[in-house]
A protein has these predicted regions:
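Alpha-helical transmembrane-segment detector that highlights a single hydrophobic TM helix
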Residues: 63-76, 84
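Hydrophobic/aromatic residues within the transmembrane alpha-helices of Major Facilitator Superfamily
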Residues: 8, 12, 16, 43, ...
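Glycine-/small-residue-enriched transmembrane alpha-helix faces in small-molecule transporters
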Residues: 1-27, 77, 81, 135
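Structural motif at transmembrane-helix junctions in multi-pass transporters
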Residues: 26-30, 81-100
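Final/C-terminal transmembrane alpha-helix of multipass membrane proteins
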Residues: 129-139
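Hydrophobic/aromatic positions within or immediately flanking transmembrane alpha-helices
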Residues: 34-35, 95-96, 123-126
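Membrane-interface interhelical linkers
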Residues: 1-9, 26, 31, 42-67, ...
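Alpha-helical transmembrane segments of compact multi-pass small-molecule transporters, enriched
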Residues: 40-44, 97-112, 131
Length: 144
């Protein structure tokens, strides 16, 4: 149950963050806004680290799959693409397409066991669910 609650909070925060970041970008620039997002996130993480145990940062160099350390780089591109999509499509349409893309890519990762994730068997019902979600976007976008 806790996982569901955290996922719902995460989705809500992503939508709010996208709107905020898009507004900051309109008043500054894409790179200034993205840099601010990453810098402010870094400050929050450092403060949290200072107050919650101070685990060894050297543990990062012990990570088995070094490519997984690129999460922050990917995060910067996530920020940029969310800002651009929300600016072009509006928050609701952008969020729907973002979620569909997340769902499709996550399924492919599971299906092929990419990045060390446990491989899952192909299931038609998951494809059907994805198609229903895409249909929802078409209905949501439908204009008279």
């Amino acid at each position: 149950m806790w996982g569901f609650i955290v996922a719902l909070i995460s989705g809500a925060l992503m939508s709010i963050q996208g709107v905020f970041n898009t507004d900051v970008t309109k008043q500054t620039s894409l790179w200034v806004s993205t840099g601010w997002v990453q810098l402010s996130a870094f400050v929050v993480c450092v403060l949290a680290w200072l107050f919650t145990g101070r685990e060894s940062v050297a543990a990062l160099w012990q990570v088995d799959n070094k490519y997984t350390l690129l999460g922050g780089v990917i995060g910067a591109f996530i920020t940029i693409t969310v800002i651009q999509s929300m600016g072009a499509l509006g928050p609701a349409k952008a969020a729907m397409l973002i979620v569909i893309s997340q769902l499709a890519v996550a399924y492919v990762i599971e299906l092929f066991g990419l990045f060390g994730v446990d491989k899952e068997p192909f299931e038609w019902r998951k494809i059907l669910g994805l198609l229903i979600a895409i249909s929802g976007i078409v209905i949501f976008k439908w204009q008279k």
